[in-house]
Swiss-Prot record:
The gene is dcaf-1. Residues 1390-1423, 1451-1461, 1494-1512, 1520-1543, 1667-1678 have a biased composition (Acidic residues). This is DDB1- and CUL4-associated factor homolog 1. InterPro entries: ARM-like, ARM-type_fold, LisH, VPRBP/DCAF1, WD40/YVTN_repeat-like_dom_sf, WD40_repeat_dom_sf. The keyword Repeat applies. A motif (DWD box 1) lies at residues 1237-1245. GO terms for cellular component: Cul4-RING E3 ubiquitin ligase complex; nucleus. Component of the cul4-rbx1-ddb1-dcaf1 E3 ubiquitin-protein ligase complex, dcaf1 may function as the substrate recognition module within this complex. PANTHER family: DDB1- AND CUL4-ASSOCIATED FACTOR 1, VPRBP PROTEIN-RELATED.
Amino acid sequence: MTSKEIYPLRSTGTMMMISDQDLKLSTQLMLRIAELLLEFDANHEQSSFDPIPILKRISELLEQATDIFIKNDPDPLDDRHPHRTHPDSALGNILKIIFKNDDFMTKLVVSYILARDNVELNIQGSRLLLACIPGLDSKVVFSEPDDFIPRLYTWAGSEGTNETLQGYAMGLLAAALENTENASKYRNENALLVPFGLRRLHELQGRSLEEQKKIGQTDFSQLHAEQSTSNGTSIPSIKITSVDGSTKENEKTFVQSTDPPPPKKRRTEPCLTSLLRTEITQRVPSFHNLRNLDDSNSKWDILQPFLIGDQQVYPLSLATYQRFILQYLAACGEYQDLLLQTFEGNALEILFDYIDLEKSKDVRLTFDALKYLTSLLVHRKFALEFVNKGGIPALLKVPKTSLASVGVVTCLYYIAYSNDVMEILCQMSDEIVDETVQYVLWCLEHSHESGMASACMFFSQGLFYKAILRRFDQYDGPRKLHNYIATLTLMQNNEDVELTEEQIHTSTQCTRGVCTTFRSYLTAHIFIKVENYKKLYGNNLPTGMRFPELVQGDCPDYKSMKPYEEVCWQCEAIVTEMLRFTGSSFREAENLRKLGMVRMFLAVRVLSRDWENISPSLRTEMCVHALETLCMMFCLPSIQTELITQHSYNHSNYDGFTILLQTSLGRYDEDPSLRMAALGCIQRCVYVEPECWKAIIQRVKSSEEKSSSASKRQSKYEIIMNHLERMWTEVRKTDGIMALVNLINCKIPLTEADSIRKTATNTLTGLARHPEVRQILAKLPLIAHNGLQNLMREPVCSDKRDIHAAFCKEAVQLLQVIYGRKIHDQQGKEIQSSEKSHRQWVIENTQVSFNQAELLQLIHDHLLKSKLDSVAAMLKSEAKLPDRPASRSINTPILNKPLPSSGNNFSKINDTYPTLAPRTLESEIGGISARRPSNAASLSSPAMATRSHSTDDDVFATPTLPRRYTTSGAFPKKLMISPARQKLRPLTPGESSSGYRPIKDLNSIVTDYFRNQHSTCKNPVTTCPPFSLFYQHKCPELSYQTNVVRNISLRTLDQELLRPHERVYSQWTNERTIFSRFRNWKTIHDHDESYTKATFSVDDEHLIVGLFNGEVHWINVDTGLDEGHTNCHGSALTNIEPSKDGSMMLTSSAFSRPLSALWRLGEALQRVHTYREDSCVKFANTTMQRIVGTCRDKATVYDTETNHVLDTYLSGIDGLQYEKNYASFSPDDKLIFNDGLLWDVRKKNSAIHVFDRLSKITLFGTFHPHGTQIVINSEVYDIRTFRMLHHVPELNRCQVSFNSTGNIMYATEVTDVHCPDYDEKIFSSFRTFETRDYSALTTFEGRRPVIDLCASHQDQKMCVIEKVRPQMSDYMIQASTQLKIVEIGRLKDNEDENDEEEDEQREDHDEDEDSDESGDGDDDEEIGGNSSDRESVFRTLGRLGDESDSGSSVDDNDTLDDLDFENAQNRIIRRQAQRRRQRLNSSENDAELPGSDEGSDEDGDDDEDGEGDPDFDMGAAIDDLVDAVDEEVDEDELGTDGDDDDSGSWRTTNSIDSEDINLDDLDEEEARVVENEGNNERPARPVDPIEAAAAARRAILGRGLRDLRMGIRGGNRRRNGGGLEQAEMLNARAEEQRVSFMEALVRGAEAERREEEGGDDGESSSSSSSDTDEYQSEEEEINSVSTTALNPALRRRNRRPDDEA
């Protein structure tokens, strides 16, 4: 045997690929079985059929296959189907063939085994069923018929007369009792049969001894020349007497004549390598001649019966009979109610005989006895008796290489679970304990899979005993345990090997056992280290930590350390801090690191996700134990660096921190305990206990003070700090801040959310020790917006209030670390907000100084009031006090800190007192806080209270500052008293207080007075002028001293008169005003393809638009015409960037190669260069000579002219994997930002900074045009200091761009253009932000998802690409995007609002304004008719009318929105006039015009004047209604006739000038006629009747409009069912506008009447002019409402010529 053992990879299968000879033999057996079953199927229904011969032959074949199966040494404890464990074995395939024949199996159980009066048939049936036991399901086979199991009890008990049938019944009952339901059901039968079985074993043992005496001792030296049919052994058999008295012997078949497999194959079995050990030959005396067989080729044939064994079922041998009884007893052994029968039957004595292989002479008999012993060892009483009677030495006598060793190690595994038994074992002699550990370790390496698993589980429990643990290390146990898992095929990175479900299952069982054992191993060593620390340091650890109360003394070697598991986490923390602080080693953890266990445990976590068909509980337990073991290894700081190393798992590389963070974030199917375990590993790497942190900071400061400038060697504590900074940095690189913040905010799972939140907060506290992390956290909403305080209000789960209290404690500590000061919680009731905490800190750290003379003046005044004039006069003369307040006098001393009293020693603290230890200090703070619910005071003296930057937690202490123990100062100051005085008993009311010092002096009282006064300031500051006792203190208010007016017009006029800083403020205010106003100007959707990208040309005259098909179009901004296009790519364009001089242009596409290209602009686009793999290319900012391209995580800089690669910047493993990574130059082209990394263009080897990723979905970063900031998602960083300046949640997932000055930023959340679905729930918008403080200016609400946004270079217009609902027809789908051009700096008018509402209500985009201008005939036909026009009017106006009373007056007409009504009407009027001109220009013949108005006039009325003018046809229904209203009001309400009504001045008021008529597209001649006719008649009317007529007209008109609306709504609802709410909103607006308009007409009519009564009759032209002026004043009053459709006076003028005719 070689000195170095080779451990082949294991797939947990014990049988390799069988040879051709074995395969041929297996095939013959299966064919023979198939023939016999066919013969049975053909004859079993005949009355003369005798099943016994067929049963015998099938049984013989099965027994032969079983012997072949046994010779291959399968796992004896693996009770799975042979076909599952060994798919190529003959036994498994034969069993499958038999079980498929349901008729045969039914006959076998029902007819043959239970046959009456046919013992031979019962025997052969039971024999066959016993041979089928390895593949049977006991729940199914033994469930029916009901009398099956009772018949077996009858045969097996004392009533049975046939021994063979009795033995077979025992074997079948053993299989039946594997089902616990049967065991409980037949409890009484078992109580009778167990004693009988034990007595039967005594009898059979005696018979076996007699048979052995007859045979004599076997001499192995004679076995060379012998060849027996039993493969080298003689087994005593029982003569079975049949019914006819003849003796039945075993019949030989053709199968038995085949030669056994060649021994060379068997010699390659793993157990053969250990057969050469001399210790084994010396163990068993009968094996003394084994060494003579070393050179024999037949060695395995000789040794097989003694190491593996075999069995003879028919004729039933004595050994097999005893085995069946032992198997039955093993099935009953674990039941407590049968333990009494076991003791009464003296089972222990029987077992001692059977486990001695020298006595049993059968290894399988010994193995079955060990199985019975294992079932009895679950009882503590039996286990104690077994060990006390020498059971351990008896077990160790079983040869390791034999089959029975599996049973031995299983017994030891059961013993390990009993503490009392293990204590006895550990107190045995060293030889026995040593041999036990060696025996189990040998089985761990060389046994079957079940034996290895039992050995592993023995150590998982036994390693808590120091006696076992010490020997486990001594005999190289960790390495052997590592080999146990490392040799598994499952743990290899080999995807070519496919494992079966059975192999995966058994491999995962092995992995779980190893992880559990290693966890116990390191836990025990940590407990031992804690005990050693307690011996060495007592109760005072150098780190300031305390020992758990449970760990008080040294645990003996024979006692278990398992009770320490309750304080395991505290012990781990102590060991971690001590190893970090002292720099000592952890040898056991270091050895595991050398073995590669860090990678192995991480592999368990990573690879377990791909292991299918294993239970979630098994996967969780396995991974939790692996990560908990890993966490214990991280107690040694040097091992923590292993998490930085990249490891390969299934062709993917991961570092440890990534694995742990992803696990802690968790998936929906992962257990919370697994997330907690992963989070605990991260916490171990980044967290430092507060006590240890203080000690480290003190040592660092002292070492820096002692170190000389010449000494360059780092101190031990500097190395500690460097290691911590490295860990903090690595966690940040793997998105640690984002992950921890998300875990703190998580609320699922409900039961464990509080625990996860607590651990995450503790981990974030450790990470916040890093100053950059602290600065980032201070800007995040968790801290800045009091998110953490909100979480502290109540627990997630109401049953976890104790855990929530621990979380609140951790949260307070986190706030203290971030703020750098003590945070008190007002007796735990309410944690202060960040603003209040900062305010309090300012007040506490304000240096209080006051005038000493003023204090003496107050004392002087008090003496005068107390009638002590002489004392007051003496004080005034001695102190030279002025007559006025000293603060108003000069040359008065200022007291910067309290002065000591000359008469009392207690007013000054003795600095020679020793400073309190940190723990004593905390107890002092806790006591004061408990008595006084206030927030801080100095513990040392009033002088120390003025030192502002000294806190209790030296989180941010620098090495140059001395150590100060202070608190924050809101509670009254308490003098620092020596430890001896602290023990004094408090005074009682009756005791004298002359010997005690007062708590405060006068200076402290005055200081507190001033500090309380300072706390009332609105904006307190730390640096204040001297306080005065006579005048109220007040900090200066924040003032914005500027004379800039708010009015933008006045501000523009005064621009030249402003001061420089006022001009800056004015410019800032102007930009805020301009970029907070936007107005829709034009909408374009003239192309069939979708728009994907847009940008303005250099001169802002054209819009360069990219389409989905890869075309680039040049659209004129003013006209909206497409002036040219070029096909640039084969897929959607994702980026278009023209150069600054307009000579070149870069384009990028989605997926077609080349992805990007450079174009030269001229008369046509000319492609210059292509960039095949770069998904985005951009020009440099200061020059056109360089281009940066992005290919995944690589940024490449090209030369523009030559297209040569200048530099390449690869982010690699440090990249943050942005969702859209587009590299870009900084404004000065000195920096490049790519995938979260900032590069210096002069140094491409390493990035200068890696930004933290704080959001799961992050777009590319954008440099600020000023060159000092960069915007990454919702964070704004200063690229000079890399500090986070702002956190703007509104910028999350937004694409940002800047205006020309860089002072304004646009942001919008873009939608993926490749997504074909239109989500109506997505309503996108863009916002504008001011880049000074990134406050939002305005939000331009959009009703559709935004794909892209761009702004012109002159900041006049913007272009937004919106995704609209696609319109489908029979043959095509219209464009699903549109271009919306927005004007900057202009308010949105009502027409824009109506357009948006109209677009939402209709589904057909052909009705839009730009489509109508195209002159499509279909559009003319659709909109030309009266019915369609009338429908459009009411749809636009929201269906005029209101369900409320139309006659109700409007209280405040100034609040009405007049523009909606006017613009909606004028827009329709203009469109109809435009169509009229188009029809007139297209043809001279009116009859040939398409879309005639007459054909579409639904009301049947001809157009007025017969001209077919559509300007008024659209309101025909409203005209008729208004006419009826006029007549009804005149005749009924006012009592006048119709003629007067037609010629009334209020109706024909001349308030519409020629411009308004031209606005409605009337001919000038018609307008002039209308005006002249309107001036002919002006009858006078009283004022009151006119106002009454107006009120009546409003009421009747409102009712009529409602009726008209209700009549039309039914037809419109079918087209506009989704827009009813918008229509109702417009109803109210339209009604209010109508009322206002009618009242304006009444006021105009009244003014005209009064003018005529005054006698002022001028000419028609002058009257027209004056009337026009009047109307202009009225127009201002009613907000320019000039709607023709609702102007009854104007309609009267147009109809009057027809009436007169």
